[in-house]
Amino acid sequence: MLNKLPEINKIRVGCPAHNCGGRCLLVAHIKDGRITRLDTDDRPDTLAAPQLRACVRGRAYLRRQYHPDRLMTPLKRVGRRGGGEFRSISWDEAFDSVAVQFERVKHQYGSSALFVPYGTGSYNQLNGSHVARRLMNLYGGCLGIYNSYSWAATNLATPTVYGTLITGNQRQDWLNAKYILMWGWNPAEMRDGTNSDYFIKLARQAGARVVCIDPRHSLSAAALADEWIPIRPGTDTAMMSAMAFVMLTEGLYDADFVRTHCVGFEAGQMPVEGAESYKDYILGVRDGLPKTPQWAESITAVPAVTIARIAREYATSKPAVLYQGYGMQRRAYGEQVVRAGCVLAAITGNVGLPGGWASGLGLQAPDGGGLWNVFPTGENPVKAEIPVFLWTEACLRGRDMTAADGVRGTQQLDNDIKLIYAVATNCLINQHADINRTVAILRDETKVEFIVVQDNFLTSSGRFADIILPACTQFETWGVEDGWKYGDEVILQPKLVEPPGECKSDYRICAELAERLGIGNAFTEGRDERAWVKYCLDEFRRIRFPELPTLEEFIDQNLGAWTRPAILPAIAFADFRRDPEKFPLTTPSGKIEIFSKQLFELGNPVEIPAIPKYIQEWESPFGEFPCEEGREGAALTLNREPTTLALAARASEQAPVLQKSPTLEEFVSPPTASRNKTYPLQAIGHHTLQRVHSTHDNNDWLEEAFPQQVFINPIDASGRGIQDGDEVKVFNERGALILPCRVTPRIMPGVVDIPQGAWYEPDKDGTDYGGNINVLTSHKWTPFAFGTAQHTIMVQVEPFTSKVKGHTSIARQSTFDPRRRSS
């Protein structure tokens, strides 16, 4: 075996980390230098240190590893940028070309014109964007980024309430909960930490009641929940506000905890004299509109009786967990729903106690995974940073971007982006919003003058490269990773097989570029990948896990992974709960800030209120804002009639408990008719088991199990003459896509669901045949976090009949076809 691996044919290895939300363990069967089979974790299984079992994506990795469409040689563009026409070149020509462009752009414009975009296609310590950032930082720096595509609003909103992102108890503590609200959370598909779904299952077996609130009946709702409550996308804050109304008016909130541990709840504890308190907002003292369940019903399509019942259950089932998913904060005003969930946890006193949950991001106590990256990327000499989602703005108008655009580290950018080095990312095209807009930006070579893409396949983003560098998979090089978000594990990724063709590891590519740029020794420090793995393990042991085995012990004992056992689960804010004066939070007040003075001082109460409020989205079934003041839910007075489902529930005085997906009869009519006549349907995009974002989209094993299709309710389908399995056109003013449909009551009426991550495959007119939802999404961002609001979409759906027999997209016609299927 390579590099002193034990002479056996089964090697424990970390599941290649593509940011699925998990960190799992595989067992690779190796014969004659080839991986022949992948199993999952076979180690002992305990509650304190459970097995890290891989999902179907990890188990299907063998197909990706030996896919016939792997990039084998460096490529150089020969046609129009984006056309997908390339020729093979040598590594020397590729390295020289890239190095020359690096030098040219740096000296012509300055280091801030260089850019490494966000990307998680290779998410361990030694591969992917980490090594590219180390290269750039040693070379003089590049334009920096902050925040993420995944949870930008959560990242910035959570600390405005708690002063930290470490708001989660260790997951073993969920077994102490009596009640769990899975609010827009789908761990069975998107993972959110290996074993999160397993711990929910154990909590339910221990007696916890589990309720899932989601527009779609997800696999998590089906497998883990006692009840599914469909809710109109983008209205979660309205339901949370109405729940607070029930708690306040019925005396169900924890008044003692609120008095001693919170600020901003009522007039006597306001950080700003005379400002509106949370209690006044909920009761409608100033705007004359109490946030009652009836008020929320017409907004959310959730029956008022159901809202009241869930409020009572959550408030009286202490300790209870309200776990927020991330899709609902990737929307217009996504910061509001994050803060609203935190406030519900606070006013019910579910903070700092076993079985409770403070909500927010929920990084795990005690350390929260705050030391994820131990591979030294170094300090960026360029201090300017932009929000990760606004990189296309920096391509178009970087020199005009200021703090008003989220710029940090400088008053104003001094450059537009002129060179992009994209490593293990499909965010240039596929995963970024408003694809057709991005295509137009990147095709204009007077804007971004040079693009390098480094990947395993010719992805949608790769098609816009000037140079493509073929990278190893993570079975073909050394790597190490730790637990995703929950951080209890360190997982080894030993090199198992040799790379095919001329593929090189991300580290080796960057090392050879560094040599040409005159910083070779500084970049490698005399280490190869294996030596850097040893360095990372030593760092983990020094600063975080003193009992972590050495690299030699990992290899000799074929450990694969090491877990810090959770014998006594850590509880976030336990000390603060016990003595808030001795152990204050890091907020300005030292307490839980229901009212944020920081947000108040921004002076934008319509879009960034100091207390969490429901704000109508800019694309909404309720139409355009009736007036500027009407952006706040408190001022909305549109005539919204109750849904038929809500009326039936009200008549019976008990909301229907849907343990299975609802039947068509249970949705006897759509929710309130959309006021958006042109694009009347809301569209959402869930994380499918077919892919990890866009990774695996060309894996036909997974595509067979989870085909790309749009999910539409029978009511919406029948009114459009659409049958199950028909090809349909989904479109709005930004673009159109063609894909098959699945007619099912597992998505609520008025909403369609398109699994995110499918590779963009346009025809010559720009219509996408790959099923990529980002053809439809908007590049608008959230007001406080400057984060993606891609889930705020209105669309229309209609039957589609191709006018061209045997139509194929331009992408599929390319010589280097990223989606070629094999037998």
Task: Label each region the model flagged.
Residues 1-252, 278-281, 423, 613, ...:
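N-terminal export/assembly segments and adjacent metallocofactor-ligating motifs
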Residues 4, 14-15, 440, 446-450, ...:
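Phosphate/diphosphate-binding loops
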Residues 73-93, 250-304, 496-597, 683, ...:
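N-terminal leader/propeptide and maturation segments of large enzyme subunits in energy/redox metabolism
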Residues 95-114, 170-179, 287-288, 308-321, ...:
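Glycine-rich phosphate/diphosphate-binding loops that line cofactor/substrate pockets in enzymes
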Residues 129-200, 206-208, 212-213, 238, ...:
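Extended redox/cofactor-interaction regions of prokaryotic respiratory oxidoreductases
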Residues 224-231, 475, 479, 488-499:
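Short beta-alpha connecting loops at secondary-structure transitions
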Residues 243, 268-397:
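Active-site phosphate/pyrophosphate-binding segments
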Residues 506-557, 694-696, 700-711, 715-823:
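Long, contiguous, secondary-structure-rich segments that constitute the structural scaffold
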